[in-house]
């Protein structure tokens, strides 16, 4: 009956009657709903059930192989990007390539037979969206591979995706305008009127069929039953009833943290209800997929392009790429309002942007965003989130996350993001307590389990709880195939700091000798693991960082002739790791004071040697600690007098850089932080000078380890200044 989307047939596609088209349209909507349900299972930590649903659908005659392939590709993409493991990335790439090819075939067939499955858009539009989505995700995996050949292919894919997304977005805007005009004029279009079934005197409207039915179709019981089934599938998905969980409304909180869970009302509601007023219950499945897919893909694409360093950005602009961070964020926010996988991926992207370890919206660079004048906007919907709200979404982001926590109670991924949000607000103890509330051994998705343990370890070092942080990190050696070298080095740095705290009398422990032994063993053997258990063909940026650090430690030990290898380590390396993961913005005053004490009062032969490069790292970190403690001028003076002169000067009005290689990440970072000092000291009046410092940071152009991380942070800060000047 529904052989329209069968693949492999060479014969010419015959013309279809309206009845055949109606059946094909309903089958398409059904298969898309089935795929959306499968992907939601994965977001609730039940990938096996989701994949089983797709297998079941694949086995049926004339199922929509295109959406099934994309759904499988999205699942594998999530697994690959959460864990960055070679085999997972390879598998996801192959599936997404298949989805690309199937999308083009399906689009062509839908256009040939005139299959109008949307009341707004021309035939085949939904497959243009599946194509761009699979293309974009595939391109991102190619970029992550760090192969020059794959990166070149990725640019071509991104270009195709970019232009098709622009085309679809314009179609959406035009359709929305036409719809508003029809509503205003009161005119009706039979081609966009939902189908009505009549049975036993009752009427049922199906929004999935965008035209009037023939008298025979209106009385077709099989057709009616199928349309009602799709309506039921959609209603259950929108309320969260489709994946076997109890009503989400009973888990919906108004605040973050464990205490808010305990404060939930005891009386339970038995009916499933939608959690947001933004959800449109009358929207057809295909239209919903088109809207959310385009908003998500074009939004993420624009944000990523806007954050790329100037050198890459200039190349992309030549081939037609333009990225607007604000417009991109608005589109991603729009996607989050849809109760489907696009909304969830959009929320994960926003959580990474606002509360991830890199925090592109730096807490210390709290410039108020300029409010954009939207009075002359052609599309008021595009302006519903103004600049200040985009910069600091606050409660809006919290509520979006809490909805996902309620909808997906079995998934540690959403709990992890809540913990990250708590950590971003400086509520570190609460973040650890929340992560401790779940048994990590019961997390099914291995990549999420690894992330949970890693994030907890990072949070623990911000709390100076190094023993437990080291245990967590070392446990990842048996779980994750990411960088075993970094895990080992990280744990060694934790034990080193514990040993130093024992030496300073800040910590009483009978394990002091054990800490010393473990620190020495783990730090200096970590480099032996480089190139092993890593997802790329070459070492990760953090791996290259480790190699350089350990070589420095060994060289200093030989230079000083000390017996204890730990005496060859000056500035405690765990504080560098804390900076990379935004620790200084998250520590309480108590922990900042302890950090300052450890950086300034511990003594050993390497520190007393006053090595210029080691002093630079120490002074940079001390200056940031002072700024967070409120001693802004004192911190700025240290940066100006002890850090910047070692690699930067202004001669005859021109900037001069002294190229150094000892700690490459530190030099552009110091210039970036100097911009933040100017902002803290001078406010809005200092923004022009802040921008000068940021441009100098950007101008320290070099391909150094962590350059992508530092470069994107600098670029985001420049954009913020530009919007406020």
Swiss-Prot record:
Keyword field contains Heme: no
GO cellular component: cytoplasm; nucleus
Residues modified as Phosphoserine: 246, 377, 380
Record keyword Transferase present: no
Transmembrane segments: none
Modified residues (Phosphothreonine): 196
Cited Pfam families: Iml2-TPR_39
Keyword set, alphabetical order: Cytoplasm, Nucleus, Phosphoprotein
Note: Present with 1770 molecules/cell in log phase SD medium.
Protein name (database record): IML2-like protein YKR018C
